[in-house]
């Protein structure tokens, strides 16, 4: 691994992705018109940013370079990324910083709960970096954060987006026992692309993780998502849908992959809005309760509204 170190600045800054420094640049095609988003400039955006910084929190909105940050933060919606800003994995698609993380902040669960209260969130999304350095992958910390939010904001519904807890026995059970309302774990891509896109993960382990959630608590909503435009074929996307339905997953998200930098995996193709609509139609026909499929779809985009629709869809089935 090549590590690039800043030796010029008075306060040297470690690059976000040292493991990618030696890679050749990967060029992507020009973004089509349907990908354009406005720069974040609203008062709501500024207020959200102030509350996040005041509580010393990290958001995946910023760290992953989410294109929807302006829209979401204007509405005071933010996805908190706990357990630090540094991930132990080095996925080819992800903009989150990689390296050896710092020790967990034991006060973080309370800070997340306080920010949730100040933002007046009715639905909160909590995600995290991968913490392969921890014996439980950070499961106890995630559970503590869920409990802290429940105590401070009892009417707020909680959605978590978790790592895969690969080789972390008992970690999943710890998180499910904390009773989040939605358990989300993203597959990210089709199985054939894992070696180049998500080399530190295992596709069928992730499927089994989602299946296990339903075995532990059949009432818990489960959710997963993939990006398209990474070189996958249509039939592979349809197979992912079948695999997720075999695990009884309720909610599927499909969005366009966007390249964070020239050192990341290239965009192989921009999928058209019509193709996304087609995927949504097929997914509903396969039995998903909720599907969000569009170029700008991201796991946490419109999460609160989508949770309400998810509840309504389940209620309709029981009538």
Swiss-Prot record:
Location(s), subcellular: Cytoplasm
Pathway terms, separated by semicolons: Protein modification; protein lipoylation via endogenous pathway; protein N(6)-(lipoyl)lysine from octanoyl-[acyl-carrier-protein]: step 2/2
Residues passing through the membrane, by range: none
Keyword Kinase in annotation: no
Signal sequence range: none
Binding site residues for [4Fe-4S] cluster 2: 87, 91, 94
Binding sites annotated in the UniProt record for [4Fe-4S] cluster 1: 61, 66, 72, 300
Domain Radical SAM core: residue ranges: 73-289
Listed cofactors: [4Fe-4S] cluster
One CC-aspect GO term: cytoplasm
Designated name of the protein: Lipoyl synthase
Source lineage: Bacteria, Pseudomonadati, Pseudomonadota, Alphaproteobacteria, Hyphomicrobiales
């Amino acid at each position: 691994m090549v590590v690039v170190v800043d030796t010029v600045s008075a306060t040297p800054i470690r690059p976000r992705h040292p493991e990618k420094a030696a890679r050749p640049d990967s060029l992507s095609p020009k973004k089509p018109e349907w990908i354009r988003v406005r720069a974040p400039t609203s008062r709501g955006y500024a207020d959200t940013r102030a509350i996040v910084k005041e509580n010393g929190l990290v958001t995946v909105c910023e760290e992953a370079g989410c294109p929807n940050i302006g829209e979401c933060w204007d509405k005071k919606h933010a996805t908190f990324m706990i357990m630090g800003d540094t991930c132990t994995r080095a996925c080819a698609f992800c903009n989150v910083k990689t390296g050896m993380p710092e020790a967990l902040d034991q006060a973080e669960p309370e800070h997340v709960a306080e920010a949730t209260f100040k933002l007046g969130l009715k639905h909160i999304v909590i995600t995290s970096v991968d913490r392969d350095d921890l014996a439980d992958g950070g499961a106890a910390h995630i559970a503590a954060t869920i409990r802290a939010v429940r105590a401070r904001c009892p009417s707020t519904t909680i959605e978590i987006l978790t790592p895969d807890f690969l080789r972390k026995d008992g970690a999943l059970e710890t998180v499910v026992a904390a009773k989040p309302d939605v358990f989300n774990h993203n597959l990210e891509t089709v199985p054939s692309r894992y070696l180049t896109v998500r080399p530190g993960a295992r596709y069928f382990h992730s499927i089994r993780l989602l299946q296990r959630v339903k075995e532990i608590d059949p009432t818990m909503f489960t959710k997963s998502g993939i990006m398209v435009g990474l070189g996958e074929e249509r039939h592979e996307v349809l197979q992912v849908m079948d695999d997720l339905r075999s695990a009884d997953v309720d909610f599927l998200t499909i969005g366009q992959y966007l390249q964070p930098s020239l050192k990341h995996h290239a965009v192989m193709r921009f999928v058209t809005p019509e193709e996304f609509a087609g995927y949504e139609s097929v997914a509903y026909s396969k039995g998903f309760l909720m599907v969000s499929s569009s170029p700008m779809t991201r796991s946490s985009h419109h999460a609160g509204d989508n949770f309400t629709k998810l509840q309504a869809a389940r209620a309709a089935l029981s009538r």
